[in-house]
């Protein structure tokens, strides 16, 4: 099993898809990696030689921020926004949507399950 950036890639999948299991690599980045290294996107992970795996590994290490480093960077960016008290930081702190979505009816993922209020008597 090929291990790249601390992630075991699934052996039966195509290389193009398997690379997307690494945090920070999507389909377009995966295609770019394979075109640069000259590896066929249709090849299966189990069919890759050790040299090809090393070539992918070195490309990712040199040119991309993935997995732990990327997660840490994102967390530090959010922490910085919270500390400086920006609007986005306040939204993060309160657990509300950050990018301008409405919150009167939607935003259940961010706000959690509904908290029902008791009806007022008329």
UniProtKB/Swiss-Prot annotation:
Task: Write down the Pfam families for this protein, in alphabetical order.
Answer: Ribosomal_S13
Coiled coil residues, start to end:
none
* UniProt function note: Located at the top of the head of the 30S subunit, it contacts several helices of the 16S rRNA. In the 70S ribosome it contacts the 23S rRNA (bridge B1a) and protein L5 of the 50S subunit (bridge B1b), connecting the 2 subunits; these bridges are implicated in subunit movement. Contacts the tRNAs in the A and P-sites.
Gene3D superfamilies in UniProt? 1.10.8.50, 30s ribosomal protein s13, domain 2 (4.10.910.10)
Q: Which InterPro entries match?
A: Rbsml_uS13_C, Ribosomal_uS13, Ribosomal_uS13-like_H2TH, Ribosomal_uS13_bac-type, Ribosomal_uS13_CS
> What cellular component GO annotations does this protein have?
cytosol; small ribosomal subunit
State a single Gene Ontology molecular function.
Answer: rRNA binding
Task: Tell me one GO biological process term.
Answer: translation
How does this protein assemble?
Answer: Part of the 30S ribosomal subunit. Forms a loose heterodimer with protein S19. Forms two bridges to the 50S subunit in the 70S ribosome.
Record keywords, A-Z: Ribonucleoprotein, Ribosomal protein, RNA-binding, rRNA-binding, tRNA-binding
> Residue ranges of region Disordered?
93-122
| Name the UniProt record assigns to this protein | Small ribosomal subunit protein uS13
| Native source species | Clostridium botulinum (strain Eklund 17B / Type B)
At the top level, the lineage of the source is: Bacteria
Q: Which family does it belong to?
A: Belongs to the universal ribosomal protein uS13 family.
HAMAP family with a match to the protein in the record = Ribosomal_uS13
């Amino acid at each position: 099993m090929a291990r790249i950036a601390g992630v075991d890639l699934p052996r039966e999948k195509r290389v193009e898809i398997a690379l997307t299991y690494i945090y920070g690599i999507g389909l377009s980045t995966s295609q770019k990696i394979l075109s640069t290294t000259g590896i066929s996107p249709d090849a299966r992970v189990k069919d890759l030689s050790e040299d090809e795996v090393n070539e992918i590994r070195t490309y990712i290490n040199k040119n991309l921020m993935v997995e732990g480093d990327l997660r840490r960077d994102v967390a530090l960016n959010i922490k910085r926004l919270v500390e400086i008290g920006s609007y986005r930081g306040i939204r993060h702190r309160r657990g509300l949507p950050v990018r301008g979505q409405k919150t009167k009816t939607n935003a259940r993922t961010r706000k959690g399950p509904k908290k029902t209020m008791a009806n007022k008597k008329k």
